[in-house]
């Protein structure tokens, strides 16, 4: 997940800078997002240390296995955060602000406040996924894309998160239930959860089509073709899951949906560079 967040931020910077992309700035954008995401992951693991030991998929993490103490993990996470904020502030104060908002949303809103209390944890915690796109955008001194496009792309990440995480949660439903984490598939039946996932996918695909009908986003035929093809694939695999809900099919949907954002952002970068050429 960290790699994907770094990629969306880097792609956002390239798309915003166009042919004036600075390699050094691109490295700083990528590094600051990696450090910030790693910081959020580390502090999140610190908060989750008592439940990570319960779940098979998380008990191999450094804190549950004793490779690092909780106190040292917390200190390490804060050092990573400080480095991330320093680098992103060098890029732009707004980049640093976006980084801080993303960190706080993931660690405080998602991990600390909501993860153990509400199925909406990944929705309200999903705003953290928006921020790397803004970090990359605000690092551009003279963006060729409007801010509305950066916000649009950031919220495409937001709308992608429910299908991605809830498909995973169906596969590991029993582990979440054992850890008393109220993920959607824990509090709803498998078939009902699949229906909700399908609805969120339809919303995401419909949202991705908005620039097809609004030239103000400054995205053109490469983006249009990319989201139409990928949207069709996403709808098809969700229809397949709806036809026969199962943990195995949900796991397949999770794996197929994972590269969706990668290809969308590749399409965005290609679209912008070709249009400016």
Give each language-model segment a name:
Residues 4-10, 61-62, 124-140, 254-267:
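Small-residue-rich segments of transmembrane alpha-helices in multi-pass membrane proteins
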Residues 70-142:
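Intramembrane alpha-helical segments
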Residues 56-97, 189-214:
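Multi-pass membrane catalytic core of lipid/isoprenoid biosynthesis enzymes
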Residues 47-68, 166-194:
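Cytosolic, membrane-interface loops and tails of multi-pass inner-membrane proteins
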Residues 235-263:
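Interfacial loop-to-transmembrane junctions
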Residues 7-47, 57, 81, 97-108, ...:
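Membrane-embedded alpha-helical segments that form the functional core of polytopic membrane enzymes
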Residues 134-145, 204-211, 260-277:
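Hydrophobic alpha-helical transmembrane segments in multi-pass integral membrane proteins
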Residues 34-43, 104-111, 154-173, 205, ...:
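Transmembrane alpha-helical segments that form the membrane-embedded catalytic/substrate-channel core
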């Amino acid at each position: 997940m960290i790699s994907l967040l770094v990629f969306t931020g880097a792609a956002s910077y390239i798309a915003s800078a166009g042919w004036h992309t600075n390699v050094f700035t691109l490295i700083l954008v990528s590094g600051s997002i990696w450090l910030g995401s790693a910081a959020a992951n580390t502090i999140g693991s610190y908060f989750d240390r008592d439940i990570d030991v319960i779940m098979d998929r998380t008990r191999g993490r450094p804190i549950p296995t004793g490779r690092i103490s909780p106190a040292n993990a917390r200190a390490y996470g804060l050092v990573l955060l400080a480095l991330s904020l320093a680098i992103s502030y060098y890029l732009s104060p707004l980049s640093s602000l976006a980084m801080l908002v993303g960190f706080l949303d993931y660690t405080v809103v998602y991990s600390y406040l909501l993860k153990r209390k509400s199925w909406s944890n990944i929705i309200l915690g999903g705003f953290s996924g928006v921020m790397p796109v803004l970090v990359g955008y605000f690092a551009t001194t003279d963006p060729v894309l409007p801010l509305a496009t950066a916000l649009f792309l950031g919220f495409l990440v937001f709308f992608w998160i429910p299908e991605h995480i809830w498909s995973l949660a169906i596969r590991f439903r029993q582990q979440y239930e054992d850890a008393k984490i109220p993920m959607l598939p824990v509090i709803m039946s498998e078939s009902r959860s699949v229906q909700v996932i399908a609805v969120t996918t339809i919303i995401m695909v419909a949202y991705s089509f908005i620039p097809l009908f609004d030239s103000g986003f400054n995205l053109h035929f490469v983006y249009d073709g990319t989201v139409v093809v990928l949207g069709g694939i996403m709808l098809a695999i969700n229809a397949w899951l709806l036809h026969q809900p199962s943990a195995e099919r949900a796991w397949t949907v999770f794996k197929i949906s994972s590269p969706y954002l990668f290809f969308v952002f590749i399409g965005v970068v290609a679209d912008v560079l070709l249009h400016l050429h």
